[in-house]
Amino acid sequence: TMARRIVSAGSLILLTAGALLIPTSAASAAERDGVCDVGEVCLYYNSNGEGSLSDFSGSIPNYGGSQPNCYEFKGPGNGQGKCVKNNAASVWNRTGRSVTIYYNSNHSGPSQTIPDGEPVNLRPELKNENASHEINDNVKLCVNGNCPV
């Protein structure tokens, strides 16, 4: 009957409209979520990319020395919740550019430049002695882990 067709069509319209209102999850990487995504530099609490990690998509002039005013390790594992400053032992650079880790705040003092795509342990003078990092925007994009310095 005509009334049945109208009800069926109305139900279909409501069902379609309802489906459009269901939220979808974002597929993009989220900084500071404890996951080392492409486009980020990740500092790890332990050597060899182990333990909790802290992920960044930009340069940080000062990690901050104590809670609640510090960047902290976010991922699961040893060190989770601790401040990054003077606690990082290894780095995985996934930014597409070289990243320099500094002993002092404000990008100064002894440093180590990490090429893109290369997870590395920090040198002894920077292991657990790090206060800032800089993503080197003035350096050409790295290719297959090779960064012009």
Mark where each language-model region is.
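Compact beta-sheet-dominated domain cores in extracellular/mature segments
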Residues: 3-13, 17-149
